[in-house]
Amino acid sequence: MKLTKTEQVLVFELSRYSVEKYTVTKFCQKLDINRGAFYRRNSNICDLFTSVLTLQTRRALRSVGNESMDRMFYRMLKKIKENKTFYGNLHRIAKDPPLFYRVLRKEYALAIENYMRPRGPFSVRKVELVANGIYAIIFNWVVDECRHDIRDVYQSIHLLLTHIEQTIRRAE
């Protein structure tokens, strides 16, 4: 999947090494735009981070063929592990982590709902609870610099996803 120019610059700048501070001015210089153009699209740097995270999460959780929900999330975990410096920097630099929570939790819930919708009835409340749990697991893994084995993190997410899939089995 092709990255947008904004994503390319941000991923390149934040993937090389650990960064404590990243400014709008530095981003605009690398993208070769003025700050006014940046602020027409984003309210601050955290807004930019959130939009890039949203795009990357949507791409990673897009169902491919007859792929299971477990495979979608495992694919996303692999992508996070491959770019752990980038994701770690985003969380470290962000001035508004609760915004990440609201947006990413919603994206996880939306991916689960899109997977479940053609398969039968499901509880929206249960989907939201599972999405909260998945966010907490992934957030803690990223904050810990992806030190835990990806299979352990995947197993934790799999245990949550089984609660959703049980709803389908009961309906059948």
Please give the residue ranges for each predicted region.
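Short, hydrophobic secondary-structure boundary micro-motifs
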Residues: 23, 88-90, 150
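An amphipathic alpha-helix adjacent to DNA-recognition modules
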Residues: 3-15, 20-32, 39-66, 74-77, ...
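Hydrophobic alpha-helical segments that form the core
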Residues: 122-164
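Helical hydrophobic small-molecule/effector-binding pocket
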Residues: 67-109
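Secondary-structure edge/capping motif, primarily at the C-terminal ends of alpha-helices
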Residues: 64, 87-90, 115, 141-145, ...
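Amphipathic alpha-helical packing segments from all-alpha helical-bundle domains
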Residues: 94-132, 136
